[in-house]
Swiss-Prot record:
Subcellular location(s) of the protein: Cytoplasm
Keyword Ligase: yes
Chief site of localization: cytoplasm
Active site: C86, H194, E196
GO cellular component term of the entry, any: cytoplasm
Pathway: Purine metabolism; IMP biosynthesis via de novo pathway; 5-amino-1-(5-phospho-D-ribosyl)imidazole from N(2)-formyl-N(1)-(5-phospho-D-ribosyl)glycinamide: step 1/2
GO biological process, one term: 'de novo' IMP biosynthetic process
Domain Glutamine amidotransferase type-1, chain residue ranges per copy: 3-222
Assembly information from the UniProt record: Part of the FGAM synthase complex composed of 1 PurL, 1 PurQ and 2 PurS subunits.
Protein name, entry field: Phosphoribosylformylglycinamidine synthase subunit PurQ
Originating species: Ruegeria pomeroyi (strain ATCC 700808 / DSM 15171 / DSS-3) (Silicibacter pomeroyi)
Length: 222
């Protein structure tokens, strides 16, 4: 299994995400934002948290125009898998790979703490290691994590069982408490919380491990 982790100027969770993939059994390649292509044979692309391009203009807006993001868009259009965490979720919405947008937190403050997440669906390669209804503890660290989508988009996300995670105690004003969503083909997950920061007992929690193990199990060649 092979994963590629994209690195932008201002990324600061790329190595954490790479380690979480590696611990689950993936061979990981770090891919620079100026690269025009992803490595051959990649099973999944990880877009990490951080402050790509300093969050200028809008979080993820400049990163979405980078050469590597054109390759990521093509990868997902072919049915490839992708995981966007925090700033990575913002990039996925800015590229149009996922619907909606991430707005400034309702309280207008940066939030860094562990929050409760409810698993809304186990019907994806990302969440099949959990049971629907499980409540897990995953850290957040963001200033612009307030998920917004119009009523039509929200209705579609609900009808198609594409809301992956919701907050048990909404920290940022996200519509319908949404913390993470899936693409229409269920092969792309964007989420504001950081599962890679809950993948080592020495760092305070392991509730994110099941996500990476589920990915490894699903993407391991038969």
């Amino acid at each position: 299994m092979r994963a590629a982790v994209v690195v932008f100027p201002g990324s600061n969770c790329d190595r954490d995400l790479a380690v979480a993939f590696e611990q689950a059994g993936f061979d990981v390649s770090m891919v620079w934002h100026k690269d025009a292509d992803l490595p051959q044979g990649i099973d999944i692309v990880g877009i990490p948290g951080g402050f790509s391009y300093g969050d200028y203009l809008r979080c993820g807006a400049i990163a979405a125009q980078s050469p590597i993001c054109k390759a990521v868009v093509a990868h997902t259009a072919r049915g490839g898998y992708a995981l966007g965490v925090c700033n990575g979720f913002q990039v996925l919405t800015e590229t149009g790979i996922l619907p909606g947008a991430l707005l400034r937190n309702a309280g207008l403050k940066y939030i860094c703490k562990t929050v409760g997440l409810k698993v809304e669906t186990s019907n994806s390669v990302f969440t099949e290691g959990y049971n629907a209804g499980d409540v897990i503890g995953i850290p957040i660290a963001h200033h612009d994590g307030n998920y917004y989508a119009d009523d039509e988009t929200l209705a579609a996300l609900k009808a198609e069982d594409r809301i992956a995670f919701t907050y048990t105690d909404n920290p940022n004003g996200a519509r319908d408490d949404i913390a993470g969503i899936l693409s229409a083909n269920r092969r792309v997950l964007g989420m504001m919380p950081h599962p890679e920061r809950a993948a080592d007992a020495g760092h305070g929690g392991t509730d994110g491990v099941a996500l990476f193990r589920a990915l490894a199990g699903a993407l391991t060649p038969a």
